[in-house]
Amino acid sequence: MDNFKYIYRILKILEKSMDLEEFDMELIGYKELDISKPRWSRIVSMLKEQEYIQGIDVWYSLDQDYPRVKLVRPEITLNGLEYLNENSMMKKVYNAA
């Protein structure tokens, strides 16, 4: 269940950042979210794959068992906004955290 909390939190932060001229990418980093780098990389990779976020580079390498992720200019997409709006379960989890 924590994975959905992290997904919602990342999307919510990116949604709020739409009003900002500059965005501090550390706000959605694994240290700020207090999760492992492998879990964070997999979550961010899934968010990009599902087209909930953009401005992220994801690739795989032989020396690492999880995806490598580079935050270039992360932004929430229309799909991500719809996910936030439609997913009431995530709202409940986010508010309970």
Could you describe each region identified by the protein language model?
Residues 1-32:
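Short amphipathic alpha-helical interface segments
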Residues 22-23, 56, 92-96:
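Short, solvent-exposed secondary-structure capping/transition elements
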Residues 33-50, 54-57, 70-71:
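Short amphipathic alpha-helical interaction segments
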